[in-house]
């Protein structure tokens, strides 16, 4: 089943096949600990690019993971989007980042 959005009385795919492929590749790379993939996912979610909805909590999570691994630009991006987020949203993003790390550690064990 393909998700659709309705615009101007026309149905169109909500996510392009290219966008789905890019996100899937980034998620796979992120699962292998690739810092650039964390950053790319942060960019995608903060801008709503590659067919994903703009989601600042998800973006903060990925920027946080990249920044924690030493990605300087991710740290700047995380700080920038934090200005647009509530304390509750930031706490949620931090919780999600910790959950991601915990899940990755369990997989590695």
At which residue positions do the language-model features occur?
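Terminal, low-structured helical/coil segments at or just beyond the last alpha-helical repeat
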Residues: 2-9, 17, 21, 80-109
